[in-house]
């Protein structure tokens, strides 16, 4: 039987920068120490795979961490959604048997959210 971790969070440097620059100034990982948890959120490669193996997790379903793109301007959220979804797709392609992913939606741009981003 496979062990599958659902909604396994990650974040990108682009998203962190957007959070910091937003008028709300909400950095979603601000409550984390800038140590191991941040490194785990940033990694979509060998370190994550090693932790999965250590924990007996066969597959992770990747999902950008909260607040995702919810508090960003519509135009910026569309650009970041595309970049993030491309990154997830590339990660899945590289590690086909280990990762799946949820789409990141630009919720500030509802019409764009229903289209491929």
Residue locations for each model-derived region?
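Helix-coil boundary/capping segments in enzymes
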Residues: 1-117
């Amino acid at each position: 039987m496979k062990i599958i971790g659902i909604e396994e969070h990650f974040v990108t440097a682009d998203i962190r920068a957007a959070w910091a620059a937003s008028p709300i100034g909400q950095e979603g990982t601000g409550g984390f120490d800038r140590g191991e948890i941040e490194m785990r959120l940033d990694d979509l490669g060998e370190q994550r795979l090693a932790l999965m193996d250590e924990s007996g997790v066969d597959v992770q379903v990747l999902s950008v961490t909260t607040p995702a793109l919810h508090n960003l301007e519509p135009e910026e959220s569309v650009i970041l959604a595309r970049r993030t979804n491309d990154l997830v797709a590339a990660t899945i392609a590289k590690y086909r048997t280990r990762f799946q992913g949820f789409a990141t939606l630009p919720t500030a741009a509802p019409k764009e959210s229903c289209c491929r981003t």
